[in-house]
Amino acid sequence: MKLLILALFLMSQSVFAHNALVWGGPGACQDGCIESAVHVTKLAGLDPMIVTPENFDASLFETAKVWVQPGGKSGAASNAMGPKIREEIKKFISQGGGYVGFCAGAFLTTPKVGQTSVTGLGIIDGKTKVYRRAKGYPSVEKMITPDGFRYHYWEGGPWFSFNSVQLKKINVKSRYFTTKGINAVETTYGKGRISVSGTHPEAPQWWYDDSHIVDIDGLDNQIASDMIKWAAKN
């Protein structure tokens, strides 16, 4: 029954022209990552469509302003997309579309996913590495931002490593307080805008509640929404 409902939902989406695409295929976690990405996309004033390998078509980009990549498993997402979908996403961005990624969505942006041999999108030069080992997560991490300290939900996300030349093309939005490693960045690829975060600004309250952790400065959904607005030029 659940599969039937999901199928009907995906079919209903195809009737309308959507201006935001959210990956909902393999690699997007099934524990609220897709729904959270959809929520902050709507908060940004956009009309999202969930995209999977089964319903993907390049024509979807004709009305889209931004591609949103949720948290989950970046390697699984890349493999499920395959070369065809990855190239279509890159083409979309280079021609002026936006890309927003949270956690796994940040891992996916570099030429290789993290420190693996899995092919990434290659829309951000540099490398991604896991901020710290998985033991003891999820957690709330203290971040350094241009506006002062901020606390973010973290669950296995990356930090970015750039050389001096690559860094000139990057606008650093936040760093991990403990290591000063780069967490969130804005940059461009061709005519398009990219905004990604190793942490989860889209995290809903129930993620914190389930893990018995507290974000002392409140939810960061507005940050996630602003990322989408900027990338979508909305």
Role assignments for model-derived ranges:
Residues Q13-A17:
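Sec/Tat signal peptide C-region and signal peptidase I cleavage site
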Residues L21, Q30-V113:
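Helical hinge/lid and interdomain linker segments adjacent to catalytic or ligand-binding clefts
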Residues K90, T199-N234:
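Extracellular ligand-binding/catalytic regions of CAZymes and related secreted enzymes
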Residues A76-A77, L108-P111, S117, Y131-R132, ...:
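Short catalytic/ligand-binding loop motif for oxyanion handling, primarily in non-cytosolic enzymes
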